[in-house]
Design a protein with these regions (language model features):
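Catalytic core of Fe(II)/2-oxoglutarate
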Residues: 70-147
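Generic preference for hydrophobic/aromatic residues in regular secondary structure cores
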Residues: 11-24, 60-66, 83, 93
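A structural signal for short, well-ordered beta-strand segments
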Residues: 18, 49, 107-111
Length: 147
């Protein structure tokens, strides 16, 4: 996570705990079209991470645009063990009704270098807020897709 935050940062602020999301076959969309900048306590420097624990494709996946304002929405296709990092602060994303026979179980969180964290990230270490962690070098990121 740390290298995706840019530069030689030594510490990163990470959303804790990650959000777990479930979508059963036949369930409606879980979140509408949005970018994270509309929510309080989100900074432009944050990097979104999405980790599906089940195969995701077509309507049981997250849909997003390739760059801010592109409006070229497409579903993300990933297998368990793969992750997606993306600019959710500026790129719009959403889900649709799950018309597949596969449930979606996923985790998502945001991370930002400590030096770029906005002043509203003050409750470090509290449940449901953020954690300050030491950065470590990447050993292998071949299972990470970036948008």
């Amino acid at each position: 996570v740390a290298p995706s935050c840019g530069g030689a940062t030594q510490r990163i602020v990470v959303q804790m705990p990650p959000t777990i999301r479930l979508s059963l076959p036949g369930s409606p969309a879980t979140i509408g079209l949005h970018s994270d900048q509309v929510y309080p306590n989100h900074t432009a420097a944050e990097v979104n991470w999405w980790l599906p624990l089940t195969p995701v494709y077509e309507s049981n996946s997250l849909w997003l645009e390739s760059r801010p304002g592109a409006e070229d929405y497409r579903p993300v296709t990933l297998s368990p063990g793969e992750a997606l990092r993306f600019n959710g602060h500026e790129c719009r994303h959403f889900t649709v009704a799950n018309e597949t026979d596969t449930s979606r179980v996923s985790l998502d969180w945001r991370a930002v270098p400590e030096e770029l964290a906005c002043g509203t990230l003050t409750r470090i270490g509290e449940f449901g807020e953020v954690a300050l962690v030491e950065a470590s070098p990447v050993v292998d990121d071949h299972n990470v897709q970036g948008v």
